[in-house]
């Protein structure tokens, strides 16, 4: 099944860039966007994505807190954190929150696309 992706990031520029990147892949669809974790949870319940990409540092609710809730509401939906911030504990905190992988924004977008492709294939 092709990915239906929810993008959760407080930067409209990042959301736009990710939408263009994902929708350039054959069959991929961005089913929704949100600008903070709280809105991301609401949007996920509305659009039922089969993949979620979210930022760490956002207003209202950060990505880790949102991921904890999303992993309980939608345990089969892979969540990947796409962030420019890192801490020494981020990987372990992310795994504990239900996040499958942390990808740095400073890396190539191909890494994120490959991750989406692999996790959606594994979930099928």
Can you annotate each of these PLM segments?
Residues 2-14, 18-22:
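Conserved acidic segment of CheY-like receiver
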Residues 27-35, 43:
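Short hydrophobic/Thr-rich beta-strand motif most characteristic of the beta2 strand and flanking loop
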Residues 58:
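Receiver (REC) domain active-site loop signature in two-component systems and cognate sites
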């Amino acid at each position: 099944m092709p990915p239906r992706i929810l993008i959760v990031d407080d930067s409209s520029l990042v959301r736009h860039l990710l939408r263009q990147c994902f929708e350039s892949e054959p069959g991929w669809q961005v089913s929704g966007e949100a600008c903070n974790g709280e809105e991301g949870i609401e949007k996920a319940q509305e659009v039922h994505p089969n993949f979620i990409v979210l930022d760490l540092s956002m207003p209202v609710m950060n990505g880790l807190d949102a991921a904890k809730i999303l992993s309980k509401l939608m345990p089969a939906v892979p969540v990947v954190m796409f962030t420019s911030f890192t801490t020494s504990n981020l990987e372990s905190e992310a795994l504990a929150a239900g996040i499958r992988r942390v990808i740095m924004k400073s890396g190539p977008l191909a890494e994120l696309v490959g991750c989406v492709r692999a996790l959606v294939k594994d979930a099928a």
